């Protein structure tokens, strides 16, 4: 039995990059996401840890870039690292708008004005890892 499907865009991969692309495409497009397995079986779903971003007033983009380059041991391209770090705060904001419930210092406080619970993890000189508690 053959089935013919028509889409404007075929996104190959259902990890963070593929799903982010699919969510950011114009809504009038017919989009299909192709995955080699169940969405809950991919690497992104099982990844532990959080997302690194400059969210603390004592942190800077330059410090984050330096930490990443040191941890990368020569494997990272500085211009790519800088571009990623410079846009990390807006990426976190986009995730919040998509409904990601990042952990806050005071879970009972209203979202507006409530600081996020940030941690310092391997390779980072400042608290910049934001998590969504399970």
Model-predicted regions and their roles:
Residues 1-6, 117-121:
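A short, basic/flexible loop-to-alpha-helix module at the beginning of a structural domain
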Residues 2, 7-18, 40-54:
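Conserved N-terminal glycine/acidic-rich loop preference
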Residues 9-33:
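N-terminal Rossmann-like FAD-binding beta1-loop-alpha1 element of flavoenzymes
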Residues 36-134:
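Conserved N-terminal/central alpha/beta ligand/cofactor-binding core
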